[in-house]
Amino acid sequence: MENEAGQLVDLYVPRKCSATNRIIQAKDHASVQINVCAVDAEGRQIPGEKTTYAISGFVRSKGESDDCINRLTTQDGLLEGVWSYQR
């Protein structure tokens, strides 16, 4: 919800899991939000270029968060050449 000035005034903004596209509940204290930055050829961070991933507690409890982060970053072009069991 926004006020007259256009500022966000909600107490809770729901997030979606990047891996499963499920809504992360407010009481899911096992969920994490990870920012992955883009780097240049020298390995330095490019200012302002980051991608945010939200991983739910359900995915983390199954032990699939590492594979999900690898899959998502590879799809977005941030990661190359990672071995995956699925190949």
From Swiss-Prot:
Effect of disrupting the coding gene: Deficiency of 40S ribosomal subunit formation, this is likely to be caused by insufficient 18S rRNA stability.
Subcellular location as annotated: Cytoplasm; Nucleus
Primary location recorded for the protein, binned into one broad class: cytoplasm
GO cellular component: cytosol; cytosolic small ribosomal subunit; nucleus
Any one of the GO BP annotations: endonucleolytic cleavage to generate mature 3'-end of SSU-rRNA from (SSU-rRNA, 5.8S rRNA, LSU-rRNA)
Entry-annotated residues carrying N-acetylmethionine: 1
GO molecular function terms listed in the Swiss-Prot or TrEMBL record: structural constituent of ribosome
Record-annotated disulphide pairs: none
Signal sequence region: none
Alphabetical keyword list: Acetylation, Cytoplasm, Nucleus, Ribonucleoprotein, Ribosomal protein, rRNA processing
InterPro entries: Ribosomal_eS21, Ribosomal_eS21_CS, Ribosomal_eS21_sf
Function: Component of the ribosome, a large ribonucleoprotein complex responsible for the synthesis of proteins in the cell. The small ribosomal subunit (SSU) binds messenger RNAs (mRNAs) and translates the encoded message by selecting cognate aminoacyl-transfer RNA (tRNA) molecules. The large subunit (LSU) contains the ribosomal catalytic site termed the peptidyl transferase center (PTC), which catalyzes the formation of peptide bonds, thereby polymerizing the amino acids delivered by tRNAs into a polypeptide chain.
Family assignment from sequence similarity: Belongs to the eukaryotic ribosomal protein eS21 family.
Quaternary structure, from the entry: Component of the small ribosomal subunit (SSU). Mature yeast ribosomes consist of a small (40S) and a large (60S) subunit. The 40S small subunit contains 1 molecule of ribosomal RNA (18S rRNA) and at least 33 different proteins. The large 60S subunit contains 3 rRNA molecules (25S, 5.8S and 5S rRNA) and at least 46 different proteins. Interacts with uS2A and uS2B, strongest interaction is with uS2B.
Descriptive protein name: Small ribosomal subunit protein eS21
Designated gene of the protein: rps21
